[in-house]
Regions:
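Generic N-terminal amphipathic, Lys/Arg-enriched alpha-helix
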Residues: 1-27, 300-301
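Short catalytic-loop micro-motif centered on adjacent basic/acidic residues
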Residues: 26-30, 91-92, 114, 231-233, ...
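Shared catalytic-loop signature of beta/alpha-barrel
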Residues: 53, 60-64, 265, 274-298, ...
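Short acidic/histidine-rich active-site segments
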Residues: 235-238, 258, 278-282
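Extended, intrinsically disordered, low-complexity segments
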Residues: 289-334
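A short N-terminal beta->alpha junction/helix N-cap motif
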Residues: 3, 24-32, 59-60, 305, ...
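Alpha/beta enzyme core
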Residues: 10-21, 34-59, 66-86, 95-230, ...
Length: 334
C-alpha cells in the first residue's frame, strides 16, 4: 500500500471548495508520457495553478503502474525544482470502470479516482460508486462519480449517444454514494469528433463550424439541487482549428473535427463546475508539432528533436487553458 501523501500529492477536496468559491475550474489534463507530464507541470508552475494529472485505465497500462507512481512523485519534485515551494498536484484515475481498478490505483498512490458507472442501471451505479467511496475514504482519497452518458470515443470510453444528466437524481445519488464530486452530461463529448456536421452550423462571421450549445439549463438545475457541490465536465477539449490545420497540412486526415467553444467552457468554469477535463487538445498539439517537424526535417531521427517541439507546443496549450479559459492561475494556497 502506497499512500499518496508520501508522494507529495494532494486530493481534490480543498482545491474544489476553493474553486467553487472563487468561480474558476481546476485543469484536469490527461497524460500518457513524460513529455506531456513535463509540459503540464511547467505550465502549472509558471501560472501558479493547482493541477490534476489525469490517467485513464489505458494510459496506466501503457505507462506501467509502478513507473507511473514514480512519475507522479517526480512531478511533485520537478515542480519544486522549478520554484514552486508548495505544489498542489492530484494524481487522478479517469473513467475507472470497476471497483478492482479503483482499488488498485488507490493502493498504488493515486489521490483521487473516478468510478464511472454511468452506463449501468441507476441502482447498480449507486451501489458501485458507494463501494468505491467506502474504500477510498479510508485513505482520504477523493471519488468522482458520474450521472448521464457522454457520446464519443476516447481510450476505452465509447458511446454513440449521449444522455443528459437527470437533475432529479443528483441529490439521491450524491447522498447515497457519498461521492466527493459529480461528472454530469450537458452536451460535451469525448474525442476530437464531438459533433457531426449535421449537428453543427457555420458561423457566418468566421466561416467556422459551430457545435450545438451546451445545456446550461441542466447545469443550472443540478446546481439548484446540489448547491456548492463540485461538478465535473468531461469531454471538454476545444479542438483548436490551428492544430487541426497543421496536422492536415503535413499529411494528416482530420476532417470535420469540432470541439467545445472556449466561451462555453469559460461560462461553465465560473459556475459550480470546478474540474474541466482536457485530453484531445493535448493530443492534437503534440501531433501537430511532430508532423510539422517530420515534414520540415525529414532526415531527423533523434526523438528529442521532435518530442521537444511537441512538449513546447503542449505547454503553450496548457498555459492558454489555465490563463484564458479555466481561470485557475495564481490560485495556489501559498
Amino acid at each position: 500500500m502506497v499512500n499518496y501523501k508520501d508522494l507529495g500529492l494532494v486530493n481534490t477536496k480543498e482545491m474544489f471548495a476553493k474553486a467553487i468559491k472563487g468561480g474558476y475550474a481546476i485543469p484536469a489534463f490527461n497524460f500518457n508520457n513524460m513529455e506531456q507530464m513535463q509540459a503540464i507541470i511547467k505550465a502549472a508552475v509558471e501560472t501558479k495553478s493547482p493541477v490534476i494529472l489525469q490517467v485513464s485505465k489505458g494510459a496506466r497500462q501503457y505507462a506501467n503502474a509502478t513507473l507511473l507512481r514514480y512519475m507522479a512523485q517526480g512531478a511533485v519534485e520537478y515542480a519544486k525544482e522549478l520554484g514552486c515551494a508548495h505544489p498542489e498536484i492530484v494524481l487522478h484515475l479517469d473513467h475507472g470502470d470497476t471497483f478492482e481498478t479503483c482499488k488498485s490505483c488507490i493502493d498504488s498512490g493515486f489521490s483521487s479516482v473516478m468510478i464511472d458507472g454511468s452506463h449501468l442501471p441507476y441502482e447498480e451505479n449507486v451501489a458501485l460508486t458507494k463501494k468505491v467511496v467506502d474504500y477510498a475514504h479510508q485513505f482520504d482519497v477523493t471519488v468522482e462519480g458520474e450521472l448521464g452518458v457522454l457520446a464519443g470515443v476516447e481510450d476505452e470510453v465509447s458511446s454513440d449517444h449521449h444522455t443528459y444528466t437527470d437533475p432529479e437524481e443528483v441529490i439521491d445519488f450524491a447522498t447515497r454514494t457519498g461521492c466527493d464530486s459529480l461528472a454530469i452530461s450537458i452536451g460535451t463529448s469525448h474525442g476530437a469528433y464531438k459533433f457531426t456536421p449535421e449537428q453543427s452550423h457555420i458561423d457566418p462571421a468566421t466561416g467556422r463550424m459551430v457545435p450545438p450549445p451546451l445545456a446550461f439549463e441542466v447545469l443550472d438545475a443540478v446546481m439548484e439541487k446540489l448547491p456548492g457541490f463540485p461538478i465535473v465536465l468531461h469531454g471538454s477539449s476545444s479542438v483548436p482549428e490551428e492544430e487541426v490545420e497543421t496536422i492536415n497540412k503535413y499529411g494528416g486526415a482530420l476532417k470535420a473535427a469540432i470541439g467545445i467553444p472556449e466561451e462555453e467552457l469559460r461560462k461553465a468554469a465560473k459556475s459550480a463546475v470546478c474540474k474541466i477535463n482536457i485530453d484531445s487538445d493535448s493530443r492534437l498539439a503534440m501531433t501537430a508539432a511532430i508532423r510539422k517537424t517530420f515534414a520540415e526535417k525529414p532526415a531527423e531521427f533523434d526523438p528529442r528533436k521532435y518530442l521537444g517541439p511537441a512538449r513546447d507546443n503542449m505547454e503553450k496549450l496548457y498555459k492558454h487553458k489555465i490563463l484564458n479559459v479555466l481561470g485557475s492561475d495564481n490560485k495556489l494556497a501559498q
